[in-house]
Amino acid sequence: MNNLRLNSNRKIKIAHVITGIGGGAGENTLFTIEGLDKEKYHINLVMGKELKEDISRRIRNKRINFFQIQPFKSRYHFLCDTILLLKLIILFRKGHYDIVHTHMTKPGILGRLAARIAGVPIIIHGLHANALEVSDSKFINIVKIFLEKKISKFTDAYISVSEIVSQKYLEYGIGKKAKYFTIRSGMELNKFTNARKNIDIRQECQEFGINGEDFVIGNVGRLVLSKGHHFLFQAIKRILEIRKNQPIKLLIIGEGKDKEKLSKYAKELNLEKNVIFTGYREDVEKLMALMDIFVLTSLREGLPRVLVQAAAVGIPAIAFNIDGVSEIIKDNYNGFLVIPRNVEQLTNKIIKYMDNKELILLHGQKGREFVQGKWSIDSMVKKTNQIYHDLIEEKITKEMK
């Protein structure tokens, strides 16, 4: 342990460790790093994946220090993970960090273990989703839970995006309740709130071959099987079987390793004319402005940012009732909650909106009202800073005894 290093006038050194900057976890991490006081903190970003050009430009413009460490593979691999662990230990020792703040599963396990071995005084883990039961392998899930229990003994705090996610971890006996803090994700919502005012709807529709008769359904997220796109495709297929002449367009916004599989599956269901893969888009709010409803079929989420963004645009949402979803979607108030994997129920809820445009407007308005003022980036940064401050004070007090 690096005793008393915190009790000085120099800047507090923090390392944020994450697989890559993409999706909600990465966005939260960047907002936090950007918002923290640079006169008080010296912050480094440690990650494995290569950066997209827009993210790289953003990091350079904000003068964020970052280290890219390989091999940072998503899947568990003993040799690669051992090498990564050793590299992190060396990095933390050389950097003399006061706080290591990890995010996501593998960086959370290896990063905290490395921080412990390197003698980092304060170790924090960010919970962006319930990652304990997501693998198809029961053995891997059991190992993750076992490791999380062990590592919890030297984890000083858990910062969760959702009360429900915290509760899941506590139910498995991971850490003590006093170590858990819930901080809502911070988001830039103005561009979503004003999306329908600031774009030429007709021009955007032309880009994707959407006409005025089409009922437009949207989905935003990584194109990976855990996002459950195939359930949504199956629901669209059923609707077209029930209503053969129903004009439907499904906008799938995002990129991911399973894009080819999903594209192939859409073709197998004869949905080529209905499903539009837009690829990665920086202007998500413009595409959301074209949608009648938003559908999220993820099988795991922490607190889905896209549902908040859709609500800010004024779009009602249908979502599988998992983890933090119910903290945003109130059933039959600003959207509908559906039993996970239940295609029949999903189909029925989509049809319910198709048959009732007034309900779309009502739920859309309720959604906008619900999210207003609750997802402040400034609030997220201030609460994170307070946790850092309290842990530092606590550590100094213990070292002085």
Which positions does each model-derived feature cover?
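N-terminal strand-loop element at the rim of the active site
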Residues: K11, A15-G23, E27-C80, K179
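A conserved mid-protein helix/loop that constitutes part of the nucleotide-sugar donor-binding site
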Residues: G23-F31, F215, N219-E241, K257-K264, ...
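A short helix/loop element that forms part of the nucleotide-sugar donor recognition site in Leloir-type
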Residues: D54-R57, T193-I210, V216
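A short, well-ordered alpha-helix in the C-terminal region of glycosyltransferases
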Residues: A115, Q203, Q345, K352, ...
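A short, active-site helix/loop in glycosyltransferases that binds the activated sugar's phosphate group
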Residues: F154-T182, M187-K191
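Aromatic "clamp/platform" in nucleotide-sugar-dependent glycosyltransferases that forms part
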Residues: Y280, L299
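Short hydrophobic beta-strand element within catalytic cores of glycosyltransferases
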Residues: P316-A319, I329
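Conserved acidic donor-binding segment of nucleotide-sugar-dependent glycosyltransferases
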Residues: D331-N332, F336-V343, K352-K357
